[in-house]
Amino acid sequence: MRAWEEFLLLQEKEIGTNTVDKWLRSLKVLCFDACNLYLEAQDSFQITWFEEHIRHKVKSGLVNNNNKPIRVHVTSVDKAAPFYKEKQMQQEKTAYFTMHYGSVNPEMTFSNFLVTPENDLPFRVLQEFTKSPDENGGVTFNPIYLFGPEGSGKTHLMQSAISVLRESGGKILYVSSDLFTEHLVSAIRSGEMQKFRSFYRNIDALFIEDIEVFSGKSATQEEFFHTFNSLHSEGKLIVVSSSYAPVDLVAVEDRLISRFEWGVAIPIHPLVQEGLRSFLMRQVERLSIRIQETALDFLIYALSSNVKTLLHALNLLAKRVMYKKLSHQLLYEDDVKTLLKDVLEAAGSVRLTPLKIIRNVAQYYGVSQESILGRSQSREYVLPRQVAMYFCRQKLSLSYVRIGDVFSRDHSTVISSIRLIEQKIEENSHDIHMAIQDISKNLNSLHKSLEFFPSEEMII
């Protein structure tokens, strides 16, 4: 069929020959009439990939001789597996969909949350959210959409609310958007969609983080749309978090965005310097550490005001103080430097940073750092840029938003770039495999990430 073949040739230019051969040319053409094309996929996973990556292109790019759109229908006939393998898969499915409801940090409570002018509103709204209709006067915003940069306290507030709701016996589901997508793909592949829907819809409240990850995932958005509608129509509570306001979400359907705005969308801002110091002083008191304020200021500066990093460092400090029997001693800056020497070294000049990753990738490909960070779409620069983004995600565990800030790109571009590299790795692309291996070896030998703190077992 000529229209389909022309469409495939166009896709080869956009996403590469290997990808087209693996995912599209392997689709079997079953039947074609003037306005309908029927394809057979090798399995359900191939259908999911088609829906996520190609469906939107087909709608605008596949037309017949009369320039009318061709509707594409994709079905699959999965091959039967041997009995023992089928039984093993059945066990895996059972274990997978007897899913846990998401654990929370017991330290993340409303009482441990530092309320400041920057976060007073979301704090009060989430607290009201956990009360019964009798307690809050029957007024409940649903959904609640929290948005703000990494480290602003979204996770703390969500987990605080979850703990309160679970204490009252509620069935509260807490997932990331990545996990929702993984569950969906697994359900499609294993033919367990009914179990998936039952799990996600028979709950009292849904808390889902990082909704921007749904960007460009049409099949995932479709399923979440119906999940949202089902929960909302039954009066079940929904809390969504993101780094972006609803109107700023990229490649997310308008109907989903409108639903996020049905309740209340609340910005939450990171702590300013004074607020951060106050928050950490409370943690110091909780951990029974006696530390001079200037020593704490030094730690804040040395660890770049990163809240998660600072909390981890304080927990290590408390354990080391206890081990060395220094609980009653006031800690000065020199004491902190001694007790957290390894942590501070990891955060110092030897720690891995996005800039060092970019420098190493640039050296490997023989291009300049400026070209990787620039706007050129030449393949000579695009591939190194994508590889650098991939390493920022893999080595530093940076969020898509943070990587976007580094490379001056929106998060959807970052997500698609990283996925492209992951896909090439899965396809065993020789060039990519060698590049990832060599660059990774170089990064591992030269640096260690700020995230890789000494484990508690190593402190003595």
Curated annotation (Swiss-Prot):
It is found in: Cytoplasm. Pfam families: Bac_DnaA, Bac_DnaA_C. Its main location: cytoplasm. Residues 103-321 are annotated as: Domain III, AAA+ region. One of its GO terms (biological process) is regulation of DNA replication. ATP binds at residues 151, 153-155. Keywords: ATP-binding, Cytoplasm, DNA replication, DNA-binding, Lipid-binding, Nucleotide-binding. InterPro entries: AAA+_ATPase, Chromosome_initiator_DnaA, Chromosome_initiator_DnaA-like, Chromosome_initiator_DnaA_CS, DnaA_C, DnaA_dom, DnaA_N_sf, P-loop_NTPase. Residues 1-68 are annotated as: Domain I, interacts with DnaA modulators. GO terms for cellular component: cytoplasm; plasma membrane. SUPFAM superfamilies: P-loop containing nucleoside triphosphate hydrolases, TrpR-like. The keyword Signal does not apply. GO terms for molecular function: ATP binding; ATP hydrolysis activity; DNA replication origin binding; lipid binding. Residues 68-102 are annotated as: Domain II. Residues 322-460 are annotated as: Domain IV, binds dsDNA. Belongs to the DnaA family. PANTHER family: CHROMOSOMAL REPLICATION INITIATOR PROTEIN DNAA. Oligomerizes as a right-handed, spiral filament on DNA at oriC. Domain I is involved in oligomerization and binding regulators, domain II is flexibile and of varying length in different bacteria, domain III forms the AAA+ region, while domain IV binds dsDNA. Plays an essential role in the initiation and regulation of chromosomal replication. ATP-DnaA binds to the origin of replication (oriC) to initiate formation of the DNA replication initiation complex once per cell cycle. Binds the DnaA box (a 9 base pair repeat at the origin) and separates the double-stranded (ds)DNA. Forms a right-handed helical filament on oriC DNA; dsDNA binds to the exterior of the filament while single-stranded (ss)DNA is stabiized in the filament's interior. This is Chromosomal replication initiator protein DnaA 1. It comes from Chlamydia pneumoniae.
